[in-house]
């Protein structure tokens, strides 16, 4: 895992998390849109089999990488990823260049700082939309940062927020125009 490696690398002082893009489908950008609902099995998100090109082998829970699932304990461990971020002895900055939705929204919440594109960044907690819940630190940290009532609004209503709105409710350090 990259985060675990960077933790122990002495010449790394800051960890930057950002998304990939632009999308070959529509040219859009995303920071992280959370778990792929197509591969969510009865016991949660599973490790999908990966092809030689690095793409998932299929579109549903039937393509679980059983060897990796056995080695990793069966499910994706987002709590472990969030724990590594929160206990990182280096600053972890989240650079949101598109959608931060669901687990991606929780990921930005647990980072030390979030910088976002004023034009492209969008934030949304999707738990209510997909019948899921935050399996990590996201909801607790969110409530600590913005208060219980505002956190419940974000989690329960599932509305989307711009970078400017997130800045106003103190979830962003700053919003920037892209270069």
Label for each model-derived stretch:
Residues 19-81, 131:
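Glycine- (often His-adjacent) and acidic-residue-rich active-site loop
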Residues 159-164:
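Acidic, divalent-metal-coordinating active-site segment for phosphoryl/phosphodiester hydrolysis
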């Amino acid at each position: 895992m990259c985060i675990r490696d960077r933790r122990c690398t002495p010449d790394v002082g800051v960890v930057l998390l950002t998304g990939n893009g632009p999308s070959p489908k529509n040219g859009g950008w995303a920071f992280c849109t959370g778990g792929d609902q197509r591969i969510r099995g009865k016991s949660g998100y599973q490790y999908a089999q990966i092809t030689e090109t690095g793409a998932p082998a299929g579109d549903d829970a039937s393509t679980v990488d059983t060897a990796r699932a056995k080695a990793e304990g069966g499910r994706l461990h987002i709590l472990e990823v969030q724990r590594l971020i929160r206990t990182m002895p280096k600053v972890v900055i989240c650079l949101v260049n598109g959608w931060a939705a669901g687990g991606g929204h929780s990921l930005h919440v647990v980072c030390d700082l979030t910088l976002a594109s004023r034009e492209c960044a969008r934030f949304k907690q999707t738990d209510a939309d997909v019948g899921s819940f935050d399996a990590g630190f996201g909801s607790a940290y969110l409530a600590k940062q913005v208060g219980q009532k505002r956190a419940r609004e974000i989690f329960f209503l599932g509305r989307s927020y711009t970078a400017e709105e997130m800045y106003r409710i103190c979830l962003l350090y700053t919003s920037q125009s892209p270069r």
